[in-house]
Amino acid sequence: MNSIDAVVRYSPLRNNLCNLPSAITTMLFSADFNIQQIIVELSWVPHQRAAQRRIAYCGWAGGITKTSSSNPVIEIDRSLASAIDLQENVNVTVNVHIDAVKAITVELEPVTSNDWEIVETHAQVLETYLLNQTRCVYPNQVLVVYPTPQTTARLLVKKIEPEVSTFAQLFNDTEVQIAPKVQKRPSISSVRSDSSGHRIRRVRSSTSTATGRRSVTNNGEVLPSMLRRSITLPNNTYAHVNDSKSGGYKVYCNLNELIPALQNAHFVSVSVLVGPGTPDRTGLTSSKIKQLNDSIDQAAQTQTNAAGSSHPPESSYTETGKVIAELVHDSKSPKGNVGLSELLACSLGIENTVGNLISLEQARKPLIKKPTVLVLHKYTTVSPASLDRVTIKHATEEQKRVQNKKERDTLLTQLMQLLSPLLDSCTFTNCVKLPKIGTLLPNGGLLQFKRIKSGWTTPLGKDNVSLEIGEEILRPESFSPSYDLLPDRKTHVRTQSDQYPTAQENLIESLSKIASGGSLLFGTSGSGKSLVISQVAQIVTNKGHFVKLLNCDKIMSESYNNLRGIFEDIFSEVSWKAPSLLILEDLDSLIPAEQEHSDSSQSRQLSEYFISKLSAQTINRDITILASSKSKESLNSLIFTTHLIEHDFQLRAPDKEARKQILQSYLDTLNVFCSEGELLNNIAVETEGYLPKDLKVLCDRAYHDLISRDILADSDSELDIEESSTPILNGSVGDIANKQSEIENGISGLELTNNSSSTIAVDKHGATIQKDNFDSALSGYIPQSLRGVKLQKSDVRWDDIGGLRDAKSILLETLEWPTKYAPIFSSCPLRLRSGILLYGYPGCGKTLLASAVAAQCGLNFISIKGPEILNKYIGPSEQSVRELFERAQAAKPCILFFDEFDSIAPKRGHDSTGVTDRVVNQMLTQMDGAEGLDGVYVLAATSRPDLIDSALLRPGRLDKSVICDMPDFDDRLDILQSVTRNMNVSKSVNLSSVAGECSGFSGADLQALAYNAYLKAVHEKLTKDESMAMAGEMDDNDDKKRMVECFQFSGNTEKKSLIELKPSDRATVIKKLEHLYQGNGNHAEGETKSKLATTAANSVIITSKDFEDSLSETKQSISQSEKRKLEAIYQQFISGRDGNMPDGTASNEIGARSTLM
C-alpha cells in the first residue's frame, strides 16, 4: 500500500493505537480487512537529529481523523508519543502493513521500579486489557500500558520469539512475560510467594473478524463483536420483512456472514460507532451527549437553587448506548448490511437513517432476577423550575397533590395498555430510550429498572411488572425521537406516489441507477429540478444507499476556507456511510463559469478542490455524485475536464400529456374536479411552454378565482334577501357602499390556501372548476420562461391581409397545422419543416404577413433587424445569434423573424470586415439541418434572395421559399376591401373600378391609395363643419335663454378685457355645453341619442371623388425597369441557378472589396 504524509495530533486514546486519515481508511474498509491485522508504520525526522529518521509501529484503533488543513492528520495518545519521542505537528510518513509475523513469546521489563509497582498492583486488569491496548511490538520498544484511566506504566521490550528485525503481531496465544524490577532485590522465596507478582502472564482473548471490535464485561470476559452497516426500517431493501413481525428490538442480517460466535447467538448488544455525521441524539456513544448532559444538569441546578426546590440530579438518568436486540436471520439482507427495526433504531437515535456503522456484540446473560417495577422518565424541553412557576400558581399544596396523583394514575393506565404488547414479546435493556407515544409521551422517555443499575431481561409479561412515573428528564428538542409508537402517528418516508408527478419517470429512473461517474441535471428555473432530485433521493434511499443533500445556494456567501471545512465534513460523512449518493443542488451558484472581466479565482479554486477530493473518493469508495444547475455552460468548465461528471440530463418543458398529468395532480391536491372531460386537454394545449412551477401557480390562481366567485355569489344572494326585507330607497349610495364594504371584508378575512386542508370548503366532496376560472387565471399571467424575453405583439389580424392566398396557405400549413393537429404530426416519420423564406417585390406584404401569422397560429413572435446582431468585433455577433436562438427556444413555440435577411446573411467571401461571414457561420450552426429546431420556426423576408448565402437555403434550414408576387386584379380588389373594411365608404364607390385602374400597384401602394382618399374625406369634413359653425353663430332666431356667449379670460391681470373665441372653438364649446344643459330625468336616454347623433355627424364618408383625387396623386413605388430586373432575378431563383457560386476568392477588379478572412 502506498505511503502518505500526515501531521501528528495528540488525542486521549489511552492505548498504543492511532486513528488514520480517511485517505487510508477508505481503502481499508473497502478491502474488508480485519482491524486487528492492520499495523501502522510511522517514520519521521526528529527535531534534535535531523539527519536520522526514527521508526515506530502501532495498531489502528478503527477511527477516522478529520482533516483540518491541507495535509492529512494522524492521532495518537500523548503518552505513546512521549515514549517514542514524537512531537505534535511533526510530519510523519505513514505505511500500512497487513500480514505480520505473529509473536509466540514476548519478554518485557518495567522501565522503573514505579512502573513495576503499577504493573504488580493491576496485574489482573493488564492481563485482561493488554490486547485491547496493543496490537504489535518491536525490539527495544517502550511499551505504554494503561491499567486505569489515571495511571500509565512503561515496559521495555527485551526479547521477541521468533526473533524479528521489524515488528511482530500479538494474538490470542501470545505469551507475555514481565520481569519484576524493585528497588531492593527480593529473595526468590518472596517472589514465588507473591501471588500478584508472577513473572509469566499469558494474555488471551477471543477472535474478532473483519471490521471487528472487542468488548469486555465487568468480570473481565472478552466478547466477540463485528461492525456492520445499518439500514433502518421501513426500507424497500427489507420490504420482504413482515411488518407485523418487525416490531420490538430486532436485527435482521444474514447469519452466514457472521463469525461462529455470533451465528449461534439469539441476542446481541447493538451500539452505534460514532463517525462523521452521526446524529447527536445517538445515546452515550457520542461524547456530545455527555457534554450536553453536563451543561443541562448545570443549568437545571442553577434554576433549582434559584427556585428553592430540590430535584434529584438528572445526570443519574442516562440513556444506554448499548441495546439488547433479537438476532433474526434474513438471507436476503445485502452483504455487509443489517436491518434495524424501528423501535431499535429509535432507542439508538438513528431512526430514518441509512449507512451508520453499528457494532454487534454477543449479549451477556440476562438478569437472573427479573425486575418487577419499571420507572418511566418523561423527556421534557422545559426545566422543572420553570414548570413549578407556571402551573397552578394559586392552588394549595393539597390541590396540587390531588391533581398530580390523578394525572399520574391516568397516565400510568394508558401507558400500561400501550406498552403491554412490548412487555409480552420484547427484550428490554435498562435505561433504554423510548419513542414518542402520542400526547402521553410527546417527547419520548427513558425506561429504567428500579433498584437495578444495569443489565437486560427477556420479555417480562404485563402481569408480572408494574409501572411507575419517575422524574422528568430535561433534554433539548433535537434529542427527541421522531418515531411514534402509535400506528396512526407513525411518520414514514413519503413514497414516490405521494409526490407531485414530474412526468419525468424515465429521467428519474436513469438518475436513480447508482453507477460509476457523476451525473448533471440541468434545466431552467422552475423546471422541477428540486422535485426530481427529491424523488431520486427517496428511491436511492429505499435501495439502501446513504443520500447527502446539500443546497449550494445557502453556503455560496461563505469564504473559501469555511467552504473547505464544510466539504471536508461532507466528504468524510459520505465516505463513512458508503455506498452513498452526494447531491449538490444548484452547484453553479458555488462554482460558476469563469467570466472574462470578473474575479473567478474562488470558482477555480473550488473546482480544483472538488476534482482532487471527489475523484479520490469516488475511486476508493462507492460514492456517486448528482449535481444540478441551470445549464451546462453555467458551471465551471474544469468540472468536465475529468470523469467527475460523465452523464448529463436536460430537464425540458413538459409536453401536452405531461402537462395534463401535472395539472390533474395539482387539482387533486386542491380537492377540485373539472366540469368538462376535455377541459384539462384544452388547458394543456393553451399552456404550451409552461414549466411545472407555472402550472402549479396557474392551478392556484384558478382555485382562488373559483373561491372568490363563490364568495361573491353567496354575498350577493344575502344582499338580495336583505333588499327584499328592507328596501333601499332611491338606490342609497351609502347603503350600497356599506354592503360592498361587508363583502370585501368577508373576502379579505378568509384564508385561501393551496392545499387540501384549506380553511374554505366549497363542498365536502370537492369543488368543480370551470373554463372561466382557468381563463381568468391565464389572463395577464406570464410564464417564467417568457419573463425577460422581448416578444413583439402585432395588432394586424389575418383578415387584414388581402391577397397572397398561396403564401398564406403555405404558412398555415407549416406553422398552424403541427400545433392544431399535434397527435397526427407527432407520429409523422419525417422531420417537419421549420424554416420559410419569404421573398418578393418591395411592399408586397412580406413583413405584414409574418407579423400576422404569429397571432393567427397562437405562437410567440420575435422580430430581428440587422443592426441588432451585427458587431464589428470578433465574438459579439456570434454571441448575439446564440442568445437570439436561446430566447426563441425559451419562448417556444415561437416564430423567429429576420427582416431584410440579405443584409444579415449575405454570401460569404464578399465582406471586407468579415462580420456577416461570422454571422452566417453561426446561423448555419444554429440552424443545423440534422438536429432541427424544436418548437422554433424561422421566417426570413427579403427582396433579393440571390444575395443570401446558398448554404442557408438548403433543406433542413430554410426549407421552403415562398414568393410574395405583385397583386393581380383579384388580389388588388381583396387588398382594397381589407384596407377599407374599417372605413365608411360611400355606396357609390366601385372598388372594382378602382382596382382596375391600379395596375402595377403593390400592396403598400394600394394601402397608401386608400389612406390618401381617407385624408381627402377628412379635410372635406373639417371644412364643412367649420362653415356650419359660422352659419350657426349668425342665426338670430335662437332662443335668448339658450344663447351662450363664449369668452376667454386673459392671463394678464393689468388689462381688464375679454377675448372672444374663434368660431371653430366656439362651436366646440357649444356642443359640450349642450350635454350639460339636458335635464336629469332623461339623462341616460339623452346621452345615448347625443352620442349617436355626434357619431353620425362626425363620420367621414369616402366618395368616388376622393378615390379619384388620391389615384391622381399616388404613384407606383416600383418602376417598370426595377420590376423587370426583380422579375428576372426571381425567375432565375425559381428555375434554378447555374451553380457558379463564388468560391470565396477575393476579386482582382478595380474598386472591388476584399475580405479579411
Swiss-Prot record:
Gene that produces this protein: PEX1
Enzyme class: hydrolase
Pfam families tied to this protein: AAA, AAA_lid_3, PEX-1N
Region: Disordered, residue numbers: 187-221, 1135-1157
Keywords linked to the UniProt accession: ATP-binding, Hydrolase, Membrane, Nucleotide-binding, Peroxisome biogenesis, Protein transport, Transport
Superkingdom of origin organism: Eukaryota
Record-stated family: Belongs to the AAA ATPase family.
GO biological process, one term: protein import into peroxisome matrix
Protein name (database record): Peroxisomal ATPase PEX1
Reaction catalysed by this enzyme: ATP + H2O = ADP + phosphate + H(+)
